[in-house]
Amino acid sequence: VKRFAKFYLALGALVFAAVTNLHAADTMESLVAAAKKEDELVFVAGAQTFGGRKGLAELEAAFNKRFGTAMKISFAAGPDMNARAARHITEIKSGRKVSSDVFLGSQSHQALLHRENALEKVNYSGIFPWVRKEMEIFPGETVLAYTSPNGIVYNANLIPKDKAPKNYADLVDPKLSPTWAGKLAIPPYVAWLAELSLVWGQERVKDYARKLVAISGGRLRYSEEERVVSGEFPIMANFGDALSAMWTWQPKGAPLVAVPGVTPINTDYFQLSVPKNSVHPNLARLFVAFMTTREAQAVLQKYESRSSHLVEGTLMQKYLKDNKIAVQEPKLSIGYYLKSEDAEGLQFKEELAKILKGS
């Protein structure tokens, strides 16, 4: 009996390994053939993701032209990325099909799904010749869609060039800060300060946050940069997609300027992945890889002024190269998000939240 038990255990292990490695053995041809049997790609994301319905229509047409498919993107606006990640985990654990065939999120969101073993394993760089290994932020699970360096944004009509900050530290420099004292906008989030502690350490960040609050004039969310453009606030301490904001507003004549806060720049890497239990898994895998093509990146640039620094010829790639700007390695923040939140980390975030509230 023991002999048979060992045999079936070994057989089960082989079957499990075969299933686990199935997607790694796929070829692009076999994926395209399988994808042609699926009629639509269900995508739930923010309302204006990838340019909203106009941008998604262009992506749909370009996708079908490249792969010879007749795919339709069934798009629905959904909750924020944290809520969508949590929903997928709940769906998978309960054995249900997931509500979106693909998931878009930054390091923190994808790390949550990775920790829960909720993502399909796909050998993207092995299957698709245009996908390089470094594009797989979580190897075999996620692929970079666009790069979002953080930074300061300010109104150049209100902040003289000789008084403009060159980094985060300048914001609280007594020689420069009188220019924006009492008028500085601060984002109401602790995440950017928590990530800054990976470079500066917790005590320096807490001291910095206190100094920011002392000269602040209000709070602005990352979607409210128009209030800097209008002059209501001359400057904002951090904006999560600073370069994209600058590239969106400057062609309209707005005096919005973005400045890196630290070097290398603290950066959000927005990646696509395929959650387990996807209804249309083959179209999903193709779409994740497709978003790194030049034609897909051109659509992102057209509608969102966003692109990947790892795709040759994109606005982001050229800007960083021409200005000799280095972005923070993904592994730095990924390591932070992959760790289970310990008591010290939670306490630090609570302290930051209290500081930002002025309490």
Give the positions of each predicted feature.
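Bacterial N-terminal signal peptides that target proteins for export
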Residues: 1-10
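C-terminal segment of classical bacterial N-terminal signal peptides
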Residues: 15-23
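Immediate post-signal peptide segment of exported/extracytoplasmic ligand-binding proteins
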Residues: 24-43, 64-65, 69-70, 177-181
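Extracytoplasmic "Venus flytrap"
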Residues: 26-28, 38-56, 270
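Extracytoplasmic ligand-binding site segments that recognize negatively charged/polar headgroups
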Residues: 44-61, 73-89, 96-233, 246
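Extracytoplasmic/periplasmic substrate-binding proteins
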Residues: 200-205, 215-277, 312-324
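Mature extracytoplasmic/periplasmic domains
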Residues: 266, 270-335
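Conserved C-terminal helix/tail region of periplasmic/extracytoplasmic solute-binding proteins
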Residues: 328-359
